[in-house]
C-alpha cells in the first residue's frame, strides 16, 4: 500500500490510494482522505461515503465529527473523484456488492480488520446513493459497525416501488445488452444550482469530479441500484442503530424553482422516510425543514 500523500483540500488533509482488483477498464483504486493532525484520543472512527457523481470536499463534516471526539475519514469510491482514472466510465459498477472491496480496504487502512483488535468502534455515514452500498455491506458483515448514519439516502426510486418494479425489466434488459451505454442526464441543473457557491449555494468544488449536470448513468449501474433498493424493501435488518436525515420536503421539477434552495431536489423524501424504517430495529428518522441534499440549510432564494 502506498504512503499518505498531500490532498487537494490543502495542507490540513492527506489522502491514501487503496489499490483494488483491476477490471475490464484497467487499474482500479479507491482513495481514503483524512485530516493530517487528528484531535487528541478519539473515541470513535467515522467512515463517510459520498453519493452519485460526487466526491469528498465537505470539510464541515470532518470539523463536526472531530469536534465531537471522533476520527473522521472519507472514501472516494472507485471511478469517482480522486479515484477516477483516464478511460474509466465514471461511477460505473454492475453490482453494488463490488463496493465491498472499497469499504473493506478503507476499514483495514483505518485499523479495522474485523478481528476485534481495534481500540475504537467505527460508525459509517453515507450520502444519497452512497448509503446503499454501506447498508448492503453491513448486512453481509454484521457487527462490523457500531452505527450507520444516512444523509438523504436513495433507498427508493423517485416513482416509489410501483414505478421501480415497472422499470426494472426494461432497465435489466438494457443492462444485459448495452451495460455502459449512457442514459439521459438525470440532473438538469437544479441540484447543482442549489449547492454550488457559484449559483448561491454553499460549496466550491471541482467540476471535473462533480459536473454541473452530473455524470451520465448507465443501464447496468441503474439496474444495480434497483437491486439494492429491492434488498432494502425486503426489510432485512442490519443489527445496528441507524439514523436517517432527510429534508422535510422534496422539489422534483425539470425547471429551476427557489424552493430548491430549501428542499431536496434529488430524492422523494416521503418515500424514503417510509422505506427507512425497514433498515433495522432502531431507526430514528429526522425530517429537517430547510435542509438540502448534502446537508445544507436553505433560506436563500
Where do the PLM segments sit?
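N-terminal cap/lid segment of alpha/beta-hydrolase-fold proteins
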Residues: 1-39
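Short, surface-exposed "cap/lid" segments of acyl-processing enzymes
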Residues: 34-77, 84-86
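Short beta-to-alpha linker loops that shape the active-site pocket of alpha/beta-hydrolase fold enzymes
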Residues: 52, 76-81, 154, 289-292
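Alpha/beta-hydrolase active-site loop
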Residues: 92-113
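Alpha/beta-hydrolase fold nucleophile elbow
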Residues: 113-128
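Alpha/beta-hydrolase-fold enzymes
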Residues: 129, 133-216
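Serine-hydrolase catalytic core
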Residues: 182-282
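Catalytic active-site module of serine/aspartate enzymes centered on a nucleophile-bearing elbow/loop
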Residues: 280-301
